[in-house]
Structure formats: C-alpha cells, structure tokens
Amino acid sequence: MTASLVGRTSTAVFALGLAFAGNSIATSLSGPRLGLIFDRSGGSLRPISGIPGAATTGQALDLGFKISGAEISPAQDAALVVNARNSSVALIRASGGDWVAASLDGVQPGPDMMAYSPGGSAAALYYAAGRVQILTGLAGAPSIAGELDVSTLPSPVTAMAVNDAGSFVLMAAGQAGAVSLYRVAAGSAPGLVASFRSVSSVRLFNAGQQALVTDTLAATVYQVTDSAGVAAIQVIASEGDGIQGLIAADTDAAGQRVFAAVGSGTVFIFDRSGGPPAAIACACAPTGLFRLAGGATFSLTELAAGPLEVLDANSAPRMVAVPPPVQAAPLPGGHR
C-alpha cells in the first residue's frame, strides 16, 4: 500500500487528484478541531473546526469524487471512504498540516459495512457475499491482515466491531426479533456469544474485553464481558430507566459512562459504577451518537438544513450547536 500527499500527486488506484496540500487545508488542521463528519446529501467529508460551543462546519474536502459511504476513525484524524463512482475504498488521513490519501491495494470494492477499532489502528470491512477483510496499521502503514469467512452467519448482518489488534470481530446477524452476536477470528468458525431481539450497534471498550450492545427493539443497553470465553451479560440500561424509543448508545473514551439517546430528544448518562442516570435534553430528534474528538463528545444529528446538535460531556454535560456549513463548491488547490 502506498501513500501520497493529496493534491500534489494522484494515485493510480483512485485517480484522486486531491487538493488538500494547499494552505487552506493546513490552516484548518493547525487549530483545535472536533473532527470529520460525513455529509450524506453532498457525498463528501467536512471538517468541524474549533471546540464545543465555538465550532464551525467547514467546506467539503475536495476528494475529486463523490463518496457514498464513510467510516470515521474514533481519533477523528482519518476516514475510510467509498467512491460513489466505482465503489473503491480509500483511506483519507491527516498528516501534519496536510490530508494524505493512502491507496489500499487489494481491498475489495463495495463493502456493505465498515467499522474502525476503538483506537483507530484497525478496521473491518464486511461484504454481503460472506467475507470480512481486516485492515491493520491504519495509523502508519496500512495492510490487509487477513480475510474471514462469515458465509455461515444468518442475514442480515446488522452491526460489527473489531479490536485494535485486528485479531477478532464481533458481528450481529439475524432477522429482527432474533439477532445473535458472534465472535469471529481467523482459523475458527464463528462462535455464538449471545442472542438479542435486535442489535443496532456494537462498541468494544476496555481493550476489547467488553462490548456495549444496543438493542433498540427491547430498549435495552447491554454490557458483554469476555466475549472470547463464556460471556457475562449485564443490563446497563433498560426501558424502566426511561430509554423508551432508544436510538443509539455508546461509551465515553474511558468506558466508564454510557450514553443512551432516545427519540424524544433526551440523552441519558449512566455511570457503570452505579447510581441514578443523569439526563440532558436536546432540542432535536436524534439520529444517532456520532463520536467527535474528545473523551465524551457526540453529534446527535447528521448534516441537514439545520445545525449539528452536539453533546459535550467532557465536564458538566451540555448541548451545543454547530452551525451548518456555508454552501460553496471546493476548488482545486484548496483555494475558494
């Protein structure tokens, strides 16, 4: 796999012609930033500069092509993107003051699902044909660490997580009402971990020893411990805690607090050591919990006509808004 400075060269695999080496991009990387966000309607990535309460959404990064999908690293310094034209996969990452594109030789086009590891060093790409490609070294020299056969899993696959070493993947699969969580590693058949009514997300934490499983049908958030052996299942939050209409759940970077967003616009915050949950209202209809930079910063909404609604729980929890981007087409060379 080769890396090139986008904007100064173009890779043969993606013919990117990216324009990120200009001063405007270097400037955008020089100050504090909350990370990247996928602009689904615009088919692009946009940077969010600043800090919670004083942040702005920047202009679309000029990739040279539209993207149909993106998985952003938890470190907010890289993203795997899918080219909308030919379904090829590219790695876009920050390096110094520039954005760099790495050509991912051997990576199959058209993944149906992508997932970064908690630390951003590895990723898993799932294909509906029944295979998973594991990428490692994403912070340095990316490589394909292996490929897993998951053709025996029921369909559809609803969620996936991979550990930082890329040594195993957790996959949720099955029809609504009967979804099972499996542990998949090279050289062994998928092993059943537990079964749920539904699984909309799986998040690994505590060095991959524990997983947070979100079951929206049951309005329950579970903690699964030691998925490599006999799994211990613990309920972190349930309907009785007020999370009816559960949309999404995630942990802070330390894995100590669990955040659960519900459709009414409330985010409940649970401490895994116990005690009653805290609650904070969002003047929005949450569509998910999209991690941003910082130990406990999440966007509750995606880019649309209005501002991004962001939960900042790095100290006293609060909701802040990030204004929508000013519409302007990116120009080659990073100049506008």
Model feature map: region roles:
Residues 10-21:
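Bacterial N-terminal signal peptides
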